[in-house]
Amino acid sequence: MDTHAFKRSLHHSDRYNRRGFGRAEEVAGSLEQAYQSSLIGSIRDNGYRLNHGRLQVRLAKDFGFCWGVERAVAMAYETRKHYPSERLWITNEIIHNPSVNDHLREMNVQFIPVEQGVKDFSGVTSGDVVILPAFGATVQEMQLLNERGCHIVDTTCPWVSKVWNTVEKHKKQTFTSIIHGKVKHEETLATSSFAGTYLVVLDLEEAQIVADYILGNGDRDSFMARFSKACSPGFDPDQDLEKLGVANQTTMLKRETEEIGRLFERTMLSKFGPTQLNEHFLAFNTICDATQERQDAMFSLVDEPLDLMVVIGGYNSSNTTHLQEIAINRGIRSFHIDTPERISADNSIEHKPLGQELIRELEFLPSGTVTVGITSGASTPDRVVEHVIQRLISLSEEN
């Protein structure tokens, strides 16, 4: 399928919208009430610091809603305003934040049901309005909705679209796309649908396995056993690793993505030499500015003397998980929560350690003067961060 031609055709359809409906002022009040916070604004103005009795709060200097998320949420609100009575669907969570998605449900936005890991579009009919979320949708889903006669509102983040353009460039030049991402993440699923031949690597360890295989140090059966669910149909590691381009899920750790890019550049240089490098490796620049800024701010925050860290965001939010990873790697006692209600008045906290299920921990806030670092993922509203801080203040006063 010529995905580039399909996108171009879709963008010219009168049933497709990716620019909103000119109703920004009409929804501004609702967005402000639901998501913004005067407390967070004052903390920003005070050098990202709040001192309250024995509690000292240190906010990361970049956190929370990025402009791509703000755009997607605003477009969803505009869509409901523009189509007040039409049946309105969204193909997935608009962003990875439970409170935002709950607000959409309250606006009678229906989420495409998922049965055994497969989306069920059987209830979607001609004339329905369907929102594509911030991290996009697969080209097959777009094609299905277009053929069904739906009105499509595309809130895909432009940074994600940039990655799609990158893998389409790889495909056009018959390069295999090495995608740094999580195989089942919605963004990576969408990106791979626009690619030709592709292989998804989770981290530097998996990238090293691929690099070793390219240089002749690997077993084909073992390789395919590991990557069989992370590659394009018919992928052949003996043929499809000769020409590589690198792309990434925009919410992955920036430093790791850069290391993976350098690893494959060195690998292809070693195999093919400097004169042929450009024929076998395509450099890339698909790292999202907002993701980079939040990670950089987190690295700065963990340099401060902190007693503990609270990271706020959806448990399925990749960028939030990576912020938690930064704190853990620095040896800081850190808690990933998705809602303020995870912090209880009895000084316990329900949180999700890296790679584990939810656990409850007692004696969350220590006695005496305590310095708490706080950050939040790109899908977390300031209002949610405010409510977390209010709970911390209450705990510091009562315990």
From Swiss-Prot:
Reactions listed under catalytic activity: isopentenyl diphosphate + 2 oxidized [2Fe-2S]-[ferredoxin] + H2O = (2E)-4-hydroxy-3-methylbut-2-enyl diphosphate + 2 reduced [2Fe-2S]-[ferredoxin] + 2 H(+); dimethylallyl diphosphate + 2 oxidized [2Fe-2S]-[ferredoxin] + H2O = (2E)-4-hydroxy-3-methylbut-2-enyl diphosphate + 2 reduced [2Fe-2S]-[ferredoxin] + 2 H(+)
Annotated binding of dimethylallyl diphosphate, by residue: 96, 185, 317-319, 379
Residues where isopentenyl diphosphate binds: 96, 185, 317-319, 379
Its EC number(s): 1.17.7.4
Coiled coil regions in record: none
Record: residues binding (2E)-4-hydroxy-3-methylbut-2-enyl diphosphate: 96, 185, 250, 317-319, 379
Pathway: Isoprenoid biosynthesis; dimethylallyl diphosphate biosynthesis; dimethylallyl diphosphate from (2E)-4-hydroxy-3-methylbutenyl diphosphate: step 1/1; Isoprenoid biosynthesis; isopentenyl diphosphate biosynthesis via DXP pathway; isopentenyl diphosphate from 1-deoxy-D-xylulose 5-phosphate: step 6/6
UniProt function note: Catalyzes the conversion of 1-hydroxy-2-methyl-2-(E)-butenyl 4-diphosphate (HMBPP) into a mixture of isopentenyl diphosphate (IPP) and dimethylallyl diphosphate (DMAPP). Acts in the terminal step of the DOXP/MEP pathway for isoprenoid precursor biosynthesis.
NCBIfam families hit by this protein: ispH_lytB, PRK13371.1
Protein name: 4-hydroxy-3-methylbut-2-enyl diphosphate reductase
